[in-house]
Amino acid sequence: MNHLANNYGYYPQDCRTQYSRMNSAEAELTSLPVHVSLQDRELWDKFSSIGTEMLITKSGRRMFPSCKVTVTGLNPKVKYVVIMDMVPFDNHKYKWNKDCWEVNGSSDPHLPNRFFIHPDSPAPGQKWMQYPISFHKLKLTNNTLNSNGLVVLHSMHKYQPRLHIVQSPDPCTPHNPGAYLRFTFPEAAFIAVTAYQNQEITKLKIDNNPFAKGFRDNGLNRKRFRDKGTQEMQDTDRQVKLDLTANECAAGMSQMVEDVDVSVSSSVDCRDTQNSSSVSLNPFISAFTNPSSAGGAAAHQTHTLLSLSNRHFSSPRESNLNSVCAALPVSQLSTGHTSFSRLNPQETHHNSRPKIQLQPPHPSLQCHDLDVRLPLPPKLSRVQLSESALRNLEMSPLSDCANPRPLTNILNRSCFRASTPSGKLLPNPPQPEQFLRGSEREIYPAVQEYTDQQFTLNSQTEHRPHMRPLTEY
């Protein structure tokens, strides 16, 4: 508690009005029992015990703890102006030596007339006494050229706050000077610094100041430390993204290679090749695995094979046909009841066959190795070929290329069906006999009569005891 008798003073007036120093306003203020007390005295005592420090910057820094005072004894109806400034505590300059402050010479000259006027001034005494007067907006600076109402101090000097209560002059007598009261607070003395020297002061301010977020985390409050940490986090995130992108690209390339290997393996549907359990769902693939499922249609099947050397430019490649033939089960190839030798293109045999409505596979599932997208050959699946027949197909003479024939094999019929609209089938597809002259047609015995016998087609010396007339075809 600062008593009026020890802190009372007069406001220095201009020399022209020195004669009016002792007036009625001064006498009135002197007669009042004005008392001023500093708030948060316990907190100030904690800082004072270890040496209070206050930061000063070029742009100005607020104090913590801030000065907050309570005033009593003022005239409720008289207006007052409340002002605060900082005055030197002593005539010394200080320095921090390891763990304590030491005197380091004489102080620099103090800069006078650096006041902070409370923003509520002037106000009647009733308002000043109603609530504590806070100076939390007061800022300290070391910029001597500052003119924005900041209090200018010297670094490494010790100061103490000083409060001025100035009675406003009477409007009727503007030249009449006003009296003032002055109060100092030694318990709030501090050393002005540009950076905290005592770590205990830093910790104490962090523990008690809810707005000291910048000093948390080991006191790394400067912008360069925050920017450095942010840059390191961004670099780490960027490196992680690059590593993930590289791994995804490598995985994508390996997946593309696997997809290419699967798609060019054969003209068979890739899903049927990879999943053996779904083979029975395709009626054409089921003929390879279960020949008996054809039922009575086996007696009306058509056997038409052409030499691969006579294929058309739009026909599938030889590698694709070999892959289709290689897909036949080995057990069926070895146990077949009928063996075939080399066949010429003109040696064909046709009977009536049931019309089955076929739909070509989806374009996305077809093999890209073919020049023309073809579905799986339906009739080739019912032919039981021996290994010798497959070798003969690959060893066709080159002389057959001189006399090319129309493709009447099973691949031609598949291409013809693929060119028709989906779900439709021509009622009378062209027969291979339409492309052969009458003298080139060969007559074959009925298949039903030789079901249990083995014979060889394309044999020039074969004895044919039962010949049917041409009119039956």
Curated annotation (Swiss-Prot):
Q: Name it.
A: T-box transcription factor TBX6L
Recorded GO MF terms: DNA-binding transcription factor activity, RNA polymerase II-specific; RNA polymerase II cis-regulatory region sequence-specific DNA binding
Primary location group:
nucleus
Gene Ontology cellular component annotations, sorted alphabetically: chromatin; nucleus
Annotated function: Probable transcriptional regulator involved in developmental processes.
InterPro entries, per the entry: p53-like_TF_DNA-bd_sf (IPR008967), T-box_DNA-bd (IPR046360), T-box_sf (IPR036960), TF_T-box (IPR001699), TF_T-box_CS (IPR018186)
The root-end lineage is: Eukaryota, Metazoa, Chordata, Craniata, Vertebrata
Which stretches are labeled DNA-binding? Answer: 43-217
Can you name the source organism?
Answer: Danio rerio (Zebrafish)
